[in-house]
Swiss-Prot record:
The active site is at residue 247. GO terms for biological process: 'de novo' pyrimidine nucleobase biosynthetic process; 'de novo' UMP biosynthetic process. Coiled coil: none annotated. One of its GO terms (molecular function) is zinc ion binding. NCBIfam families: pyrC_dimer (TIGR00856). Homodimer. Its cofactor is Zn(2+). This is Dihydroorotase. Keywords: Hydrolase, Metal-binding, Pyrimidine biosynthesis, Zinc. Pfam families: Amidohydro_1. Catalyzes the reversible cyclization of carbamoyl aspartate to dihydroorotate. GO terms for cellular component: cytoplasm. The lineage of its organism: Bacteria, Pseudomonadati, Pseudomonadota, Betaproteobacteria, Neisseriales.
Length: 344
């Protein structure tokens, strides 16, 4: 039977929620990943160092006994952010600030309205070596939802990189050929995370044969040509600029199967197996370890994990749902098969 042993991976873009939801989902990430970069879009958002440290304590309390998993904490960037906050965050071990353009995604109401007014804050991030994590979509109502990432590149990303050229930027959960091209052409201070859904699915999987609410995420799934461009990027010559970030974003089944359903896919349960499928299909299984376990750590300036995990070429059936607080949660590929299984 084919096996693949790799350095334990890290999830560089994860939503863990809070309360009972946190307790339901954290163990799934902790059994696969050594570390994860924790997104700060709670209600209310994680905007202060005290918020982040309190949230980290709640995450640690939700982990299985004996778990070595480490959450890497971030702050939610707001219009009120200051260079002093950046310095305080750095001193407290916060790894990054996350940009949510106001209204772009779940719990982004407190997001930034004009990033260019925060240039002094971004300059301080560059000085302190704190990363800038970007949800790269414009929110103007006149811009088509399928074009919002591409529009963001010209309107925001390129001008910001020109003004703060040494800022370390992660273009999060990229979904388009344009975003991949930007990262490929930018300096080594610019990298990107890529989700399993954007490597495996296209917008037909969302809309053909009926609306599939469990395939609805933001940024929304794009054309097949974009999916192919992402696969080419993560397996190509400059693959070191791309790394694993699931954007696993749990919502109760009742909130997804809804007249106005929530955006987000829960992939943490079988994340590394889904990525293995991508790399296997691309004939690039030998590049999975760098994507999952090396590139992100290097970009963040942290050591690689010292232990390993082993994947077996053995099919598994993903559960139709799992308990989630008072309700249930539908994982990615629910009820379907994945050709790889992690040996726990």
């Amino acid at each position: 039977m084919q096996t693949l042993t790799i350095i334990r991976p890290d999830d560089m873009h994860l939503h863990l929620r809070d309360g009972d939801a946190l307790k339901a989902v954290a163990p799934y990430t902790a059994r696969q990943m050594g570390r994860a970069v924790i997104m700060p879009n709670l209600k209310p958002p994680v905007v202060s160092v005290a918020d982040a440290l309190a949230y980290k304590a709640r995450i640690m309390a939700a982990l299985p006994e004996g778990s070595a998993f480490e959450p890497l904490m971030t702050l939610y960037l707001t219009d009120q952010a200051t260079p002093a906050l950046v310095r305080e965050a750095k001193a407290a071990g916060i790894v990054a600030f996350k940009l949510y353009p106001a209204g772009a995604t779940t719990n982004s109401d407190s997001g930034v309205t004009d990033l260019f007014k925060l240039i002094p804050v971004l300059e301080e991030m560059a000085k302190q070596g704190i990363l800038f994590l970007v949800h790269g979509e414009v929110t103007d109502p006149e811009i088509d939802i399928f074009d919002r990432e591409a529009a963001f590149i010209g309107r925001v990303m390129k001008p910001v990189l020109a003004q703060v050229p040494n800022l370390k930027v992660v273009f999060e959960h990229i979904t388009t050929a344009e975003a991949a091209r930007l990262v490929l052409e930018a300096g080594d201070n610019v990298a990107a995370t890529v989700t399993p859904q954007h490597l495996l699915l296209n917008r037909n999987d969302l809309l053909v044969g009926g609306v599939r609410p469990h395939h609805f995420c933001l940024p929304v799934l794009k054309r097949e040509t974009h999916r192919q461009a992402l696969v080419a990027a993560v397996t190509g010559e400059k693959a070191h600029k791309f790394f694993l970030g699931t954007d696993s974003a749990p919502h109760a089944k009742s909130a997804k199967e809804n007249a106005c359903g929530c955006a987000g896919m829960f992939s943490a349960m079988t994340a590394i197996e889904l990525y293995a499928e991508v790399f296997e299909k691309a004939g690039a299984l030998d590049k999975l370890e760098a994507f999952a376990s090396k590139n992100g750590a290097r970009f963040y300036g942290i050591p690689e994990n010292t232990d390993t995990i082993t994947l077996v070429k053995q099919s598994q059936t993903v559960p139709a749902s799992i308990p989630y607080g008072d309700g249930e949660l539908v994982p990615m590929r629910a009820g379907g098969e994945i050709g790889w299984t992690v040996q726990y």
